[in-house]
C-alpha cells in the first residue's frame, strides 16, 4: 500500500523543475498516512520531496555511469528524517539539545490571546527571545508571556512584534489566510523557481564516481532549516559542502 497523493506531489515537483516525466517511472513509494501526529499530511510532503531529490541524484548517477536504478522511499523513514534533529548525533552526542532552556523559560511556541485567537512566537534564537521579552515587557518565564498575550488580541500582538521585525504570526484559518494580502500573493506564485544567475562553462565530471555528486563543490551561506538542509542533502549524495553560518 502507498499514498497516491505522494505520486501526485512528486509529479508536480518534478515537472516544475523541468525534468523529464518518464523518469517518474523509476520511483516506488511504500507506507500510508498518518506517519506523524499532525493535521497536515507531513508524510506525503516528506516522501515526495525526498523522492524528488533522490531521483535527481539517480538521474545524475545514470548520466555519469550509465547505471540506472529504482528509487524507493518509505513514508515512515521519510517522516523520521523530517525530525532528524532528534536523532542526529555528533561524535556520539546530540549537541542540539545540550543547551536547551528549561520548559518554563522557553517562550518559543503557541499562545492563546485575549480574543481567543492564537499566535506563534519564534524565539529559538537568543536575540529574538530577548527582543520579544523586551517588547512585551515580560520577564523570562513562559507564564509571564502567556499572561501578557491574554491582554491582547492575536492581531494586535502580531502587529506589535512584526512591526519591529520580530518573527511572530497570528494563526489563521484557511479562509482568513486566503483573504490576507500575503495569502493572495503566495497563491499567485509557483512553489519554487530556478533562476540562472550567471554564465560559466559546464563543469567536466568524471565518468567513474563513487557518489552521484562527487566533484561538485558548494558554498552554503544559508542559516535556518530549509537552507542548511539543501547543503546537507547535496553532501549526502557526494558533494563537497562548506557551510558558513
Can you name each region flagged by the protein language model?
Residues 1-245:
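Acyl-CoA thioester-binding alpha/beta core of soluble enzymes
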Amino acid at each position: 500500500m502507498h499514498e497516491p497523493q505522494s505520486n501526485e506531489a512528486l509529479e508536480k515537483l518534478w515537472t516544475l523543475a523541468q525534468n523529464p516525466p518518464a523518469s517518474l517511472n523509476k520511483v516506488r513509494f511504500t507506507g500510508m498516512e498518518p506517519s506523524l501526529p499532525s493535521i497536515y499530511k507531513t508524510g506525503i510532503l516528506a516522501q515526495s520531496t525526498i523522492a524528488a531529490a533522490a531521483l535527481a541524484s539517480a538521474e545524475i548517477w545514470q548520466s555519469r555511469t550509465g547505471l540506472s536504478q529504482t528509487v524507493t522511499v518509505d513514508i515512515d523513514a521519510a517522516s523520521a528524517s523530517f525530525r532528524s534533529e532528534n536523532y542526529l548525533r555528533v561524535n556520539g552526542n546530540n549537541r542540539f539539545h545540550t543547551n536547551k532552556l528549561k520548559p518554563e523559560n522557553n517562550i518559543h511556541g503557541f499562545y492563546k490571546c485575549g480574543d481567543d485567537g492564537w499566535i506563534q512566537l519564534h524565539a529559538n534564537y537568543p536575540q529574538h527571545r530577548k527582543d520579544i521579552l523586551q517588547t512585551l515587557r515580560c520577564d523570562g518565564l513562559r507564564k509571564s508571556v502567556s499572561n501578557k498575550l491574554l491582554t491582547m488580541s492575536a492581531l494586535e500582538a502580531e502587529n506589535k512584534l512584526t512591526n519591529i521585525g520580530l518573527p511572530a504570526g497570528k494563526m489563521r484559518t484557511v479562509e482568513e489566510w486566503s483573504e490576507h494580502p500575503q495569502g493572495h500573493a503566495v497563491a499567485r506564485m509557483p512553489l519554487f523557481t530556478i533562476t540562472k544567475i550567471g554564465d560559466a562553462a559546464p563543469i567536466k565530471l568524471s565518468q567513474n564516481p563513487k557518489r552521484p555528486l562527487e566533484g561538485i563543490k558548494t558554498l552554503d551561506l544559508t542559516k535556518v532549516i530549509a537552507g542548511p538542509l539543501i547543503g546537507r542533502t547535496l553532501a549526502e549524495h557526494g558533494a563537497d559542502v562548506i557551510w558558513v553560518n
